[in-house]
Amino acid sequence: MKSVHEALDQILPEIIAMSEDIYCHPELGFKEFRTRKKAIEALDKAGIPHEDVAYTGIRAVLDSGKPGPNIGLITEFDAVPTFGHPYASEDSCAAHTCGHYGQLGVMMSLFLAIRESGMLKDLCGK
């Protein structure tokens, strides 16, 4: 079993690359199809089950298989209209001035570190 720190060291380069890619390809709310695809690719690669929710949302669950509390974590995908931003999309002027690309990176880091470290077996609930 890896420590959480070892797991993070291993996955961070990929998570940072994903976050930077999302930063450079901003999408407005309910139009985050590319961002959603990137998140799903990361979840699939880690073998984390997920399902579609809302229009462009995803619900992923790490289940310990033991009874216990459920802890909900949420992240947002959308960018906001920001005229003149160097990374604003040409068609919608969307840019990640809100930091949601970073939220997604943190969330994926948590999910993947828990999964990759084997820490889930020491937890209960979902």
Which residue stretches match the model-derived regions?
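Acidic/His- and Gly-rich active-site-bordering loop/insert found
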Residues: K2-T97, Y101-K126
